Amino acid sequence: MNAARPSTEHCDLLVIGSGAGALSAAVTAAHLGLKVIVVEKDPQYGGTTAWSGGWMWVPRNPLAIEAGLVERIEKPLSYLRRELGEKFDESRVLAFLKNGPRMVEFFRRHTALQFIDGNVIPDFHGHTIDAALGGRSICAAPFDARQLGDRLHDLKPPLQETTLWGMGIASGAELRHFLNALHKPASFWHVTKLVLRHGRDLLVHRRGTRLVNGNALIGGLAQSAFALGVQIRVNSPAVRLLQSEGRVTGAVVQTPNGEVSIQARCGVVLASGGFPHDPARKQQLLPHAPTGHEHWSAGNRGNTGDGLRLGESAGGVVAGDLVQAAALAPVSLVLRPDGSVAHFPHLIERAKPGLIA
């Protein structure tokens, strides 16, 4: 007996993945009037972004300019030229530097996603010529997840080990309040209010609704997507791309109810994350990891390189000449009460004096 032919659906744009890149593409396309479907293989949307700090490096962004931190484009261009060395591509870098601020303004003006500034956060390599002492970073502002309604519980919660009883703590000023809660009355009162609200959220919603960091970034994007009619489907991995006459026309998606063929008139966006949990790809691209099992990643466990393989199936080529194919940080393995093992990233610790890693 022949296997049943997948049912067929149609849209203008199909987005594979549901992190910040995926949802940014979905929201932008929907704002321009396209019918968009987002498919996510995990049971919850948000990807690694939902676990992240939610920070973005966007020189000359509107928040910095509003604070009086104005610089010519040549400054960050020079910084990146020195940082990237022989991999510097001026056309790409200029495209990023020119369109990054436009992106921030678009989301501020047209979506639920808002931002807080990082005007006192310096560039990573402060001794590089044309590095800045601040004004080049932004972060998602706290977001009230009650706006998500019945899709709240489809949002991936923050990594448990980075929270206080499941409550996310925003980096920057809020984190300083928590560190000073037993020393400064203002900090104690600030923390008390947040803890009381979180307790109420647990009673009413079974999870926190004041989202911060990467969770806020996903919350704001998801709310905007839903408001624009974007469909976000979880438990729906893309298994292969559809092609016709040399172009990608859609994808076959495995859903809880069987395979669905989604035809996308304008194309497919591959935004399903990297390859931190793909040993074969790590073995190929990380010379110091000869078996592909030398590193533990704090990235989403669903990041197994699916998008790269899908791209290769359509003739794409994954660059193999990168100076460094991974962003590395110390990770601890934390045994949870249920027997599972969490991968805890020591991101803050990287900046502490005396760290050896």
For the regions a protein language model found, what residue spans apply to each?
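Eukaryotic low-complexity, mixed-charge intrinsically disordered interaction/regulatory segments enriched
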Residues: P62-A64, G68, P76-F88, A95
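Long, well-ordered early-domain segments
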Residues: E83-D123
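Short glycine/proline- and acidic residue-enriched helix-loop micro-motifs
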Residues: R81-E90, D201-G208
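Residues forming the flavin
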Residues: M1-P76, F115-A357
